[in-house]
Amino acid sequence: MNATQTVGADWELDFYSRPILEADGRKRWELLVTATPAADATEIPFRFSKCCPSGEVNSLWLTAAIGEARQCALEAGWPAPRRLRCWRSSMRTMVQRAATELDLEMIASRRTYALLEWLQQREQEVYPQEEGFMAGPLAPPPAPVATPPVPLPEEVQGDAWSWASLPADLLRDASDWPSSFSGLLPLPAGLDSDQPVPGLRLFSNSRALAMAGWLGGLEPVKLLVDGRQLVLEAGQDDRWLVSDLDSAAAEAIAGDLSQSKELGKGLQFIAIQASPEEQAFAGFWMMRDIATL
């Protein structure tokens, strides 16, 4: 493998029960870890899975298992992780304890697209083949975020914004674009090259770079239209109000996002630039609205 095909050695982690009953009648617990792939990755990133005895579901077991995963990665030529992203709020405290013991940064974030796709694949192809499999959903997904959106922090509010779209094929070269901050993703398999990818452009003549730094820290997950508001979901459960919309704009943007979810694998983007005419980006993030989120 090529160790350069991970982004900053970030890992995405899920430690939770699976729809499989063990011999003792208890649900199987499993740790899944995957490295976050770079936008131009051409192979499956580092992955690690380990079952946990139901009586040992605690931070001590998790710490040891993540340490084992780190050793496996190093032995296989992958870089050790610096950060762990945890997407389940119910497991946040336990993962934080394990990360602290291992001197790793833990980020509570749903920017775990590679992990969620792997989880979906295991739900469809792996778990049903296991003895003790319980038909039904993999595990209850996190409850839909219901908190009212709050205005974006002042540090991320620009002078203006616009709604835009880019052909999917253009995003293949996104890693070559001049950008001070970015969060790029591999293009999903089976995506048509001319599929429009909708997104938000934010502009600020004087503060574009600072805005980009702040937005990256928010861990942007996906854009959606809620009533007549454009909302950015971020982190583990944050909802940020980007802008109020008139009825025509709300309908048009919601339609673009719906089409992307149906035909474009849920791909979206956010760009921050000094002006609409500027070619370079202060920041550029790709996001996905996928079913598990």
Residue ranges of predicted features:
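Secondary-structure boundary/capping micro-motif
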Residues: M1-L293
